[in-house]
């Protein structure tokens, strides 16, 4: 898949938490969020931890474990919200899943290039 750039925002990073506390983002700074998301995209570790929490881990589709060692994430505070730029070759479905694990449904996708 071709590399794409995703432009995302989170209104209040201090409230950006996923459904599973043990997998959620725990920081408050844009830099720490960028590092957490970048790690989640570059390796399958977060996905593997999520899979282990499922009632039937063997039934989970392993295609979602794909990672992109070259993924980059930049984040910066802009007024009262955080602007995030993700560059990756991963499909949107994988990015969305990992974002939801880290930040719940607090993020908004604004553009893809």
Model-derived features: where do they sit?
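Long, contiguous binding/interaction regions
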Residues: 1-79, 87-113
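Basic nucleic-acid-binding interfaces
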Residues: 84
């Amino acid at each position: 898949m071709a590399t794409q750039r995703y432009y995302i925002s989170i209104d209040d990073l201090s409230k950006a938490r996923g459904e599973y506390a043990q997998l959620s983002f725990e920081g408050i700074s844009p830099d720490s969020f960028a590092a957490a998301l970048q790690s989640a995209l570059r390796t399958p570790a977060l996905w593997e931890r999520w899979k282990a929490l499922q009632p039937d881990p063997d039934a989970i589709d392993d295609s979602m474990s794909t990672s992109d060692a070259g993924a980059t994430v930049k984040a910066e505070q802009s007024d009262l919200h955080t602007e995030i730029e993700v560059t990756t070759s991963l499909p949107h479905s994988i990015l969305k899943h990992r974002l939801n694990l880290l930040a719940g449904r607090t993020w908004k996708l604004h553009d893809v290039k």
